Amino acid sequence: MDVVQTTKPLFPDTLLHIYCLKGHPPQVSDGPGDFLGTWEEDGYSFLFFLQPRQRFVDTLLETCGELEQTDYLTMTYRQWQGDFVEPLKIGRFVLTPPWLKRVPAGDEIGLRFEPGLVFGNGTHPTTLACLTAIEIVCGGAPITRMLDLGTGSGLLALAAARLGCSRVVAVDNNMLAARTARANVIHNGLEAEILVACGHAQHFVQCSSELLVANIGFRVLAELVAEAGLSAHRWLVLSGLNQVETKALLPLLEDNQILLLKRWQSQEKWNTLLCITQFGR
């Protein structure tokens, strides 16, 4: 487990310098002071800086011969994140960027939230379904301990803490994501409630909790269910699954005496499952 520090603050007009590489470089621990982090997806890596850093990237390419630079982009943070520059209402939750102020009205739950450079601005169907499932679970008997695997920008962990979970562990294997989550924890003053860690889900799944949330994809979920059984947890919210993957996962849940309570399907693709283990019955 790595201790997670925060990312540098970003504002709508912050100019980003983005280098796209084919392949995955080693973790950059001695980059320039304006290095923001690396995001990896589908065999490509995106290195983010606040200044042009072609010389640094060239050195990285020389050191790691299997890497290839495919693009260099500049854009503002507003352009990178699209529309997320104003408060966003999702159910009872109102997500407000740190540079804006908004007082929640009525039963709204306010969260100061910055998606940073990573996936997770709150609008993806799996995120919406997970938020609904967390509200259902936390609306019953009090939930104290929550484990969030694949936390991304930390939104689900923040929501759980605001709904009463006082001991939350949020995990992501991407340091940039973990740093973003840590920054959002600080934005909301929830350092006492939420611990953010950078590591693999398999290393944390045995940490017992009343609520496990894993919006993490089929391969890891299937491995966690098959090898760990998830018996250290009571409620499970499993997401990031397409139809075929869900069909393959359901027998694994049944084999491990995990009962499916509710299933959300959106856009005829994304599935989110609310389950309870034998431990919770």
Predicted regions and their residues:
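N-terminal auxiliary segments of SAM/dcSAM-dependent transferases
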Residues: 2-104
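S-adenosylmethionine
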Residues: 173-279
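Short glycine-/acidic-enriched loop or helix-start segments at secondary-structure transitions
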Residues: 57-59, 105, 158, 223-224, ...
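Conserved SAM/SAH cofactor-binding pocket of Class I
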Residues: 123-201
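Alpha-helical structural signal in soluble globular domains
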Residues: 45-46, 63, 159, 163, ...
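A short helix-to-beta-strand connector/capping loop
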Residues: 68, 91, 107, 166, ...
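SAM-dependent Rossmann-like transferase core, predominantly class I methyltransferases
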Residues: 81-140
